């Protein structure tokens, strides 16, 4: 008999076989319940924005300045200055951002959690965050980790003589990892062409991914799959940086600006490096990559395996990067760790050693650095920056600010004394309110006008939904404020039914103009407000038809953006490829429609009950694209009833697929065989998936009609106001 002690508790945090193990294709609703109050240690009334406003930012920056040159024996500073390390830390915090779904980025301080804290590309950034702990500890809840990581990058640049564009706080911390799709590979840094490759065809990178390998922020610095070809690497750079919303000029500025500072680390073989933080021993207290090579730190540090210092002044802003890039010819060599890198042919030893003042080295570059010279488009920009140092400095300052603030959303979220005054197009600017707002009496009068305009409940509801549901909680973009639904590109999106939308907007514009023309004292209603108000009127009318009197909350204050304030290309990524709330799929996808619905719900910050009640309500209100009848399980469309759930759960109906792709179904009467309803996967999932069925049963019960209306109104109002950061 074994003498090994047996744990009496089988249900420990280490876990047993999970539902995901048994049913790997089961629809995952967990992403809808991340970051709840249950994981947040702060008091219920804690307001981070108010806490940050009380922060002495100048004092924090003084402490950070002092930290830069206070080298610690347990992780010594290169060149006696931590600036390069902290620039990399901030860059990698923000650099996970991707435009396709707005996920990633610096908001929330996700670099603290798995998997990001253990990505190979984030090696030894655990040390950077530990260096910051005394400062975070000192200022506590008044500055989040998310804000501190970016602020530290800014201060690092400033301490090395660079003038930054500005800094905004306002990133509240999260307390658990995001549930983000980073790829399907099972091995860190797995090369393309494998069974789980993120590439297909002619090196087409899977959407929404924005890095070339699992565990990298952008590209492989040695070149594609480690092939040291600067021209081929340029293709990867252009693709990945574009997926982070950067154009060629911003890309060149970021690479050259960032690589003006610090160095890479590859003193010895990767086999001497221990496991990443999440796999390291408990005694290491959350640190990873413990190295057995010599001292394992300082001169002996191993991070990327590359051993490159770009400039002769790695702790000062300079023009050396471009000077070296264009002044030398480059020959391929290998780092002490065996990684591909380049050294200046026949050059003098002008590069200082990071730890030995008596030593000098020849200039070195990464394969991806040389892309800025050997790619024709990048070369033109690089040479212009080389010849115009002030232009380069301005471009880097602006690109750095964009990199570190892109996922913060509108300027209304920016906090602190260093917020730049200049309004930037990528911030999706909206005019400030410049007139008296409508009051409750005006709201009632406008609702009456809208309901008398000839527009149907379905038209009012679908237009308001189309306007507001572009919002993404990931990067805080989109939403009803700005009324960009009337502008390119949104007005032309297939999901918005352009011809029908134009007719609705024309009618609402008539109501708006008549109201505004009749006012004295400058009072106005914006079209952005009126679209949402009209949707509220439609919901109230539909609830009344169901026998429930309800008032949909409404807060005026939205403004109308102009076409000139709208970056058409940047706005295009908000176009839904699927909107299960409107039973819409742009085309066939490998991902099941129900999974796309849950993804959309997560971007709208909805939980399971909110998702459920909104789908059921929007179906009976007739919000489907193209007036499709799939999922309209009611004989009284336009009435806010719980009929969707009642009829979906009716065991008198038998469902069968009627399409080859199993994405359209007929529901027939079990007794007569007569077709009663048609539905999609997005409809039937509420009867098939055990958790969603449990929610559907709540709303399909005999006593649920009033609760259903009340819950629908609450969820509807939430979506309508997701972008109202001015109300917070």
UniProtKB/Swiss-Prot annotation:
Sites annotated Transition state stabilizer: 88
EC number(s) stated in the UniProt entry for this protein: 1.11.1.21
Transmembrane regions: none
One example of a Gene Ontology biological process annotation: hydrogen peroxide catabolic process
Tryptophyl-tyrosyl-methioninium (Tyr-Met) (with W-91) crosslink site(s): 218-244
Modification comment: Formation of the three residue Trp-Tyr-Met cross-link is important for the catalase, but not the peroxidase activity of the enzyme.
Sites where the protein binds heme b: 259
Residues annotated as the enzyme's active site: 92 (proton acceptor)
Cross-link (Tryptophyl-tyrosyl-methioninium (Trp-Tyr) (with M-244)): 91-218
Pfam families: peroxidase (PF00141)
Heme recorded as keyword: yes
Top class in the EC scheme: oxidoreductase
HAMAP family recorded: Catal_peroxid
PANTHER family: CATALASE-PEROXIDASE, HYDROPEROXIDASE I, BIFUNCTIONAL CATALASE-PEROXIDASE
Oligomer and partners: Homodimer or homotetramer.
Name of the featured protein: Catalase-peroxidase 1
Source lineage: Bacteria, Pseudomonadati, Pseudomonadota, Betaproteobacteria, Burkholderiales
Record gene name: katG1
């Amino acid at each position: 008999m074994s003498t090994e002690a047996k744990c009496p508790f089988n249900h420990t945090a280490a876990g047993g076989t999970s539902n995901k193990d048994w049913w790997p294709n089961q629809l995952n609703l967990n992403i809808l319940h991340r970051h709840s109050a249950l994981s947040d240690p702060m008091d219920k009334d804690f307001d981070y924005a108010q806490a940050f406003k009380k922060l002495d930012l100048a004092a924090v920056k003084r402490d950070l300045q002092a930290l830069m040159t206070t080298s610690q024996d347990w992780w010594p500073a290169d060149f006696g200055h931590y600036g390069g390390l902290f620039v990399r830390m901030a860059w990698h915090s923000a650099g996970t951002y991707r435009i396709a779904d707005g996920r990633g980025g610096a908001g929330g301080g996700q670099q603290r959690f798995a998997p990001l804290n253990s990505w190979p590309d984030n090696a030894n950034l655990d040390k950077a965050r530990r260096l910051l702990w005394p400062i975070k500890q000192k200022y506590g809840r008044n500055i989040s980790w998310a804000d501190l990581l970016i602020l530290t990058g800014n201060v690092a640049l400033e301490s090395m003589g660079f003038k930054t564009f500005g800094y905004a706080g306002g990133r509240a911390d999260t307390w658990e990892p995001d549930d983000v799709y980073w790829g399907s590979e099972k091995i860190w840094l797995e090369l393309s062409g494998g069974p789980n490759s993120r590439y297909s065809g002619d090196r087409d990178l899977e959407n929404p991914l924005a890095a070339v390998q699992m565990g990298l922020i952008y590209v492989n610095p040695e070149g594609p799959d480690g092939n040291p070809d600067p021209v081929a690497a340029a293709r990867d750079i252009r693709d990945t940086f574009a997926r982070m919303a950067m154009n060629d000029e911003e890309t060149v500025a970021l690479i050259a600006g960032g690589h003006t500072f610090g160095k890479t680390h590859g003193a010895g073989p990767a086999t001497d490096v221990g496991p990443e933080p999440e796999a390291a021993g408990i005694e290491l207290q959350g640190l990873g990559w413990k190295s057995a090579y010599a001292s394992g730190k300082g001169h002996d540090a191993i991070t990327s395996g590359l051993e490159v210092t770009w400039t002769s002044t790695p702790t000062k802003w300079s023009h050396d990067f471009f000077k070296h890039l264009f002044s030398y010819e480059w020959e391929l060599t290998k780092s002490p760790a065996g990684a591909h890198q380049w050294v200046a042919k026949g050059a003098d030893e002008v590069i200082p050693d990071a730890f030995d003042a008596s030593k000098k080295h020849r200039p070195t570059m990464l394969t991806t650095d040389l892309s800025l010279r050997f790619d024709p488009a990048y070369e033109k920009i690089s040479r212009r920056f080389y010849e115009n140092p002030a232009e380069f400095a301005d471009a880097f300052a602006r690109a750095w600010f964009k990199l570190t603030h892109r996922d913060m959303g509108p300027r209304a979220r920016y906090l602190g004394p260093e917020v730049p005054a200049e309004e930037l197009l990528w911030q999706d600017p909206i005019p400030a309110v410049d007139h008296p707002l409508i009051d409750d009496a005006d709201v009632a009068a406008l609702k009456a006008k809208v309901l008398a305009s000839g527009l149907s409940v379905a038209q009012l509801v679908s237009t308001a939904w189309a306007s507001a549901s572009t919002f993404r909680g990931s990067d805080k973009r989109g939403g009803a404020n700005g009324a960009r639904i009337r502008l390119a590109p949104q007005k032309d999106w297939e999901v918005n039914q352009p011809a029908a939308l134009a007719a609705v907007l024309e009618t609402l514009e008539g109501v708006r103009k008549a109201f505004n023309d009749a006012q004295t004292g400058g009072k106005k209603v914006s079209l952005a407000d009126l679209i949402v108000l009209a949707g509220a009127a439609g919901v109230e009318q539909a609830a009344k038809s169901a026998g429930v009197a309800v008032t949909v909350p409404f807060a005026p204050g939205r403004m109308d953006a102009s076409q000139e304030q709208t970056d058409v290309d940047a706005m295009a990524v908000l176009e839904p490829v699927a909107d299960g709330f409107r039973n819409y799929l742009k085309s066939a996808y490998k991902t099941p429609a129900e999974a796309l619905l849950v993804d959309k719900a997560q971007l709208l910050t909805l939980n399971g009950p909110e998702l459920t009640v909104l789908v059921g309500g929007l179906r009976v209100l007739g919000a489907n694209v193209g007036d499709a009848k799939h999922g309209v399980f009611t004989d009284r469309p336009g009435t806010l009833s719980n009929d969707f759930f009642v009829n979906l759960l009716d065991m008198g109906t038998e469902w069968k697929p009627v399409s080859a792709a199993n994405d359209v179904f007929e529901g027939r009467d079990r007794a007569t065989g007569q077709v009663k309803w048609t539905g999609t996967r997005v409809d039937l999932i509420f009867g098939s998936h055990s958790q969603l069925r449990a929610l559907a049963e709540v709303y399909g019960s005999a006593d649920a009609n009033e609760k259903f209306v009340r819950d629908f109104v609450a969820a509807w109002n939430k979506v309508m106001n997701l972008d109202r950061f001015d109300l917070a």
